[in-house]
Structure formats: C-alpha cells, structure tokens
Amino acid sequence: RLSVRDFRISDAAIRYEDDSTNMRFSTAPLSLRLRGNMSADRTDLDLRLTAAAMRFVSGGIPLLSDAEAELVAVIDADLANNRFTFSRNTLRLNAISVGLDGWVELDGDAVAMDLKAGCDKVQFKDVLSLIPAFYTREFKNLTAGGELSMELWARGEMRGPALPAFELKTEVRNGSFQYSSLPKAVTDINIAARVSNPGSVMDKTVVDLSKFGLRMAGNSVAATFYATNLVSDPVFRASADGRVD
C-alpha cells in the first residue's frame, strides 16, 4: 500500500479517441489534488478535480464543447474492505451543480454500489450552455427562462455485462429561449424523460420520453418516444403532433 498523503496532477491534457464508435473526448488543462493517509486502513480522502475546455463527441455528434467541470469531494475510504462512502460532494459542470451521496465497494471484478445524485431548479439557460449548438459567440445575447430538475440513482452490482438497477429522471418546466437577432422566442418548453433498468443487462434499459412540447412563432409541437430491448430486438413507440405555418 502506498504511503502517500498528498497527490497532485497539474495542467494535464487528456485525449481519448475511439474510431469504432466515432467517440472523442479531450480536456486541458486538468488538475487534481488528493489528500489522505493512503497507508491507513481507513482515512478521509479530500479530492478536488478541475477540468477546462472539455469536449465530448459521440457518434459524430458534439455533446460538450469548451465545458468546465469541478469535483469537490470528501470520501470516507475503508481501504481494508475497498469500500468508499461519499459525503459532502459536489460536481459542477459549467453553472450546474449536482450533489452525490452513497457508497461504492470493490470486490474482485465486481463493483457494488448504492448511489444517488440530483439537482433541483437549475436555470434553463445554464442547461443550454452545455449544448454546443447553443453555446456559441452569440450565447451572451440569448435570453432564457424556465427550470430543470434531475434525479439519478444506481443500486446493485456491476459485473461483466450485468448492470445495477438504475433510474435517471429529468424534467424541464416552462422553458424558453430567444436570441436578440430573432423576432420570436421559443416558449412553453416542457419535457419529462426517464431512463431506467431493473438491474440486468443493457438490453433491459427503457427510454421513456413521456412529454416533449414547445411553442414557436405561434406554432405548437408535442411528441413522445419510448424504446426498450435496444440490443436484441428493439421496440419503439413514438408520436408527434404539431402545426407549422
């Protein structure tokens, strides 16, 4: 076991590319500081991680562009039993802060966990700042309203292809946005989405977009989407209703 009390990484650059899935991730600079008595059976790990200019592309689609992230965490580390309990933890992505609680235990090739995370009443403009299509040089001229909330939990064991039970729920309420150069705003943005798995293989994952609606220049659009059996025999249901003049 390492006799380390203070470990640091400063101004690192990380780049990951997977040509088979057209996935790209990069960030620079990245800094990490980890404090704790790593030679003890049990210790508090004080972790601070910052990353700037984060870029993430999946399937050729830009999902993050020049985002900033910060993780501040105090972890109760039971090093003798490889069990780590999270408390007083905050992950920030741009202006969005997410709290994290729970524990993770490493057991051979398995990872057991009981985790939950969430954020409440995040400003809709802060969410738009994460989307490359919105976060351009014109972003400062964007006015936006509305709120987003998110809840995530994962419980069980991850081993090989087996996943723990998990659920991610997110909701956008009364969202709106408008660029100063455009005559009309997009209003009444209301979204309710859920991704869940009962604790099995990826094939059992359910994607349920039960509500998607907005109004633009007097035209309204509403849609729903449902998918499951994504690997073996995909099942999809979708609906759309709208008027565009």
Enumerate the language-model features and the residues they cover.
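Flexible, solvent-exposed coil segments and beta strand-coil junctions
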Residues: S10-A12, A52-M54, L79-R83, V127-Y135, ...
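Transmembrane beta-strand segments that form the barrel wall of outer-membrane beta-barrel proteins
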Residues: R83-T90, V206-F212
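Elongated, acidic membrane-bridging lipid-handling scaffolds
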Residues: R1-R83, A193
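Transmembrane beta-strands of outer-membrane beta-barrel proteins
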Residues: L45-L47, M113-L115, F166-L168, V207, ...
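Amphipathic hydrophobic-ligand
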Residues: S20-R35, I61-A73, T90-D101, S129-R155, ...
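Short loop/turn motifs that connect adjacent beta-strands in outer-membrane beta-barrel proteins
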Residues: G160-P164, V201-K204
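Transmembrane beta-strands of outer-membrane beta-barrel pores
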Residues: A51-R55, L106, C119-Q123, V172-S176, ...
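Solvent-exposed loop/turn tips at the surfaces of repeat/solenoid architectures
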Residues: F7-I14, A28-L30, A52-M54, N89, ...
